């Protein structure tokens, strides 16, 4: 096996008067900026993407529908009926909010004992108040119905009113001050008005 050693182009034996600059073959000459931007298509082989190389298609393969179904079920979560229904109680019976329970009803709940016990196995105070929601109609003091009656026009009204017109109704006629006029009296220096 023969090893080649790189020889310096200007060795120490070269006289100084023969020293000439050596140019590289990779010197950029001519229209190198324009030629650099030209697209040269690889004719020997079309370049392959990573996806095409690593993921080979299988023509007879069918997707696994069962795993798709399980993943879809996991992403969607529980259906609406399992989230809203509680002990098969109708949803309009337990719409009392926690705020209303704490501040207006003062934690009054007839179904729960006054003192809860500590469960050492579950590490919880039982019974939990969240498991036994307050049953009853929602407390909404009629504000929603009042605003709904104000916002929605009566069914017999066909003309659409603007928000300004509906917000500022016309006051009744009795609220306005009546304009009263004095009886005109002619000045005395003029001729008297003839009477017939």
Swiss-Prot record:
<feature type="region of interest" description="Mn 1">
    <location>
        <begin position="46"/>
        <end position="61"/>
    </location>
</feature>
<dbReference type="GO" id="GO:0036126">
    <property type="term" value="C:sperm flagellum"/>
</dbReference>
<dbReference type="InterPro" id="IPR054709">
    <property type="entry name" value="CFAP107"/>
</dbReference>
<comment type="subunit">
    <text>Microtubule inner protein component of sperm flagellar doublet microtubules.</text>
</comment>
<dbReference type="GO" id="GO:0005879">
    <property type="term" value="C:axonemal microtubule"/>
</dbReference>
<dbReference type="GO" id="GO:0160111">
    <property type="term" value="C:axonemal A tubule inner sheath"/>
</dbReference>
<protein>
    <recommendedName>
        <fullName>Cilia- and flagella-associated protein 107</fullName>
    </recommendedName>
</protein>
<keyword id="KW-0206">Cytoskeleton</keyword>
<keyword id="KW-0282">Flagellum</keyword>
<dbReference type="Pfam" id="PF22595">
    <property type="entry name" value="CFAP107"/>
</dbReference>
<feature type="compositionally biased region" description="Pro residues">
    <location>
        <begin position="184"/>
        <end position="196"/>
    </location>
</feature>
<dbReference type="InterPro" id="IPR037662">
    <property type="entry name" value="CFAP68/107"/>
</dbReference>
<dbReference type="GO" id="GO:0030317">
    <property type="term" value="P:flagellated sperm motility"/>
</dbReference>
<feature type="region of interest" description="Mn 2">
    <location>
        <begin position="96"/>
        <end position="108"/>
    </location>
</feature>
<comment type="function">
    <text>Microtubule inner protein (MIP) part of the dynein-decorated doublet microtubules (DMTs) in cilia axoneme, which is required for motile cilia beating.</text>
</comment>
<keyword id="KW-0969">Cilium</keyword>
<feature type="region of interest" description="Disordered">
    <location>
        <begin position="168"/>
        <end position="196"/>
    </location>
</feature>
<keyword id="KW-0963">Cytoplasm</keyword>
<keyword id="KW-0966">Cell projection</keyword>
